[in-house]
Amino acid sequence: MIKDAVNTETVEVNPVDQVRSTIYQLLSSLFAKEIDHKILHDLTSEQAQQFWAQLGSEAEFKADVDVLVAELAKLNTDKALLELAADYCGLFLVGTKYSASPYASLYLDDKPAKKGDEPLLFGEQHQQMTQFLKQSQLQVQSEFPEPADHLAVILAYVAHLCTHSDEAEQHSFIKANLANWLGNFVAKVTEVDTGNFYQALARLTYSWVKSDAEWLESELN
C-alpha cells in the first residue's frame, strides 16, 4: 500500500504497538483491493483464525468479527469470490450515488456540492496526505493508482505511525484525519451495501479506530 521511499533504520517496537500496527495494516489491505484466492487463504489460515478469535474476544468488536469470519467461510467457490469482488467494485470503485467512495475529501469538504458536480479527487486532503507520507519518507505504491486520501492509504499510514512515532502524534493524526469522517463513511456503506462483508468491515474499522484513539488518549493522560 505504502512503502519506504528511502531506506530507514529498523526501530525497536513494543508488542502492543506491533499488534496495533498489524490490525491497521489488515484493515488497510481489505479496503485496498478485492479478496482473491491468496488473500482468502491468508484470512482463513490457522494463524488468521487465532487472530480473529482474539480480536473478537473484545465485546465491542465481536459482532462484526463474527460476520466477517462467517462471510469468509462462504467464499468456497469462484462464483462467491466474484460476487464479493462485484460488491467491492460497486461500493468503492464506481463513483455513483449507490457507492461509498473511500476518500476522506468527499466527507471532509465543507463546500456543498452543486447538483451534477463531480466529486473533487486529488484535492486538498490528497495533497495533505501526500505531504504526511513525504515527511515520513514514504510513498504510495505505484500499483495503487488512487488518491492518497483513500481510506486504505490512511490506515496503512497509521500502521506505520504505530511503530515509528510517539503516542501524541498518533492520537493527533487519527483524530484529525480518520476519526472525524469515518462515521459518515460507515453510514454510507451501510446504506448502499447489499451484502454483509463490507458493512461489517466498515463498522469494525470504525469501532477499532475509536477504541484505539480512546486508548491513546488514556495513555497520554
From Swiss-Prot:
GO cellular component, one term: cytoplasm
Superkingdom per UniProt: Bacteria
Subcellular location: Cytoplasm
Keywords for this protein: Chaperone, Cytoplasm
Coiled coil regions in record: none
UniProt main location, coarse: cytoplasm
An individual GO BP term: protein folding
Function field: Involved in the biogenesis of TorA. Acts on TorA before the insertion of the molybdenum cofactor and, as a result, probably favors a conformation of the apoenzyme that is competent for acquiring the cofactor.
Family, per entry: Belongs to the TorD/DmsD family. TorD subfamily.
Protein name listed in UniProt: Chaperone protein TorD
Organism, as annotated: Shewanella pealeana (strain ATCC 700345 / ANG-SQ1)
Gene: torD
